[in-house]
Amino acid sequence: IIFSAVKEKRVKIYDERKREINLDTVEKAIIDFEKRFSGKTIGKDSIWDYIRPFIGEFQFEEFVDYTYEDLDLEKKVKAYCPYIVRYREFNGEKDDTVQMPLFWIFPEESKDTNDWFHVPDTIISVHQLRYPNQMPFSTNLFSLVKENKIQVFRPNGEEFNTFKQIEDLFVVKNNYVYYDEETGEETLKESFSDIVPEDIIAIRIGEGWKINRKSLEIKKQIYFFLPLYQYDEERFGQLGLRIYNKKHRNLDKQ
């Protein structure tokens, strides 16, 4: 849908500085990118069909509205940019990729409410929580969950057996080796620390996308989210909770 509109010049395209660019500029950049990183020379007449399978990422300029009282989230997309993603190495531990942003689209809000294409898959993304939204959202999340005022699920969507299982998620257990200088013996011990609202630094979101075939406007509907906490200076962990967005809380879970 997007590529057809771009090829037929039915939509204006821009670079990362929001300067309008022409189709020839994008096509030349794609040809140079493929020749450099895949060693293949592609013709202008086959560019868009050739790169379609390699569109592996989108960058969005979007706004997130938070309703702190009931943890409801809503996204509004202002602009987006598709990326070519080429894997040079993929082994489960290290993903070595090269990426190329193609163009930015700033669609107008669609007046046609019928001509939408619904992406069939649930899209998973990570959204960073930053001040000033982080603290009231995280604080109320802790309050609602710990007081059992909102229904939560395991990350896979299954229900918890007991409320104690939910409470235990807010405590991190670490194993460490204790060395006794007097005896010279090493003992494996456990330490416990509480997860606090300040530790929640991001949420993993499951969402549905739809795109208007005429205006190319993209709308997102958030189905659920999973809080992520700061595990150490370099890593974050999954708290172990799936919280459905307000519109999906009393429906059959997907």
Feature names for model-found ranges:
Residues C81-Y83, L226-L228:
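Extended serine/threonine-enriched, polar tracts that run as long, contiguous segments within proteins
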Residues I1-E69, R86-N91, P107-K214, D232-R235, ...:
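A domain-level signal for the mature, folded cores of soluble proteins
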Residues P101-I105, L239-K246:
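Conserved beta-strands of PAS-like sensory domains
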Residues P53-I55, K75-V77, M100, E198-I200, ...:
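Extracytoplasmic
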Residues Y68-A79, R213-F224:
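Short, solvent-exposed coil/turn segments at beta-strand boundaries
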